[in-house]
Amino acid sequence: YPFFKKLENAKNKKVRIMHYGDSQIEGDRISGRLRQRLQREFGGNGAGLFPVIPATKKISINNSVSKNWVRKTGFGPYIDKTINHKNYGALFSFCKIKFDTLLSDSNSLFNADITINIPNKSYKLCRNYKKLKLYYSAKEKVTFRLLLNDSIFHIDTLSKTNEITLKRLDFSETPKSMKLQFSSNKSPDIYGVSLEGENGVIIDNIPLRGASGTEFSKVNYSSLSQMQKLLSPDLFILEFGGNTIPYIKSK
């Protein structure tokens, strides 16, 4: 089987596993144990892909955000009716900056940030990572700053793009604290952040509460495809249960 051959070579190349499921895998349940065992055996570090605002807390990550971030969800009974498109990417959700309409005009700049600290309750290998990957699209240019341990590490501009785009940053050792800062007059859409090692196994924990597993056919294929090509997964695990059972009304 090709996947197991890739696992054998994982210490020299990344192997990505995307674990989708319903609420039974929330909080990194199952994914976390599987990640720890495979990373210990075949190499790898980091918690993998997660949204700016997770639906529930995960032991594998330790992040916080400024209060002006909002989450837009595209699965189960939680679909945001204010969104007039289905471009949700691989996590079936995205996050954006909520602007104050009373203060905003075409020249107003708004700021938001994401703080990521080393998790203190995760498995050991989740606490080490040397790569940060940001998946986004932007209607206007966005000033982006990355602070490591309260010192500016990188300043850049996220280009205007309708497609989901990857911003990648590498560092020599795991920072105790990272702060991602965004400044723009139009919010970017952030589809996910990934923390990874140089090589080895990456396992993404993607819980979709209330989902039946049919969501793959309900979102925009182009958006999903763009992000999946950037992620380049080697294996999908689909773990859906009771939400797939049709409701039957007795007469």
Residue map of PLM features:
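Membrane/wall-proximal cationic-aromatic binding patches
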Residues: 1-19
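N-terminal, post-signal-peptide region of Sec/Tat-exported proteins
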Residues: 15-16, 25-27
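Conserved SGNH/GDSL esterase-like catalytic core that processes O-acyl groups on lipids
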Residues: 26-147, 157-251
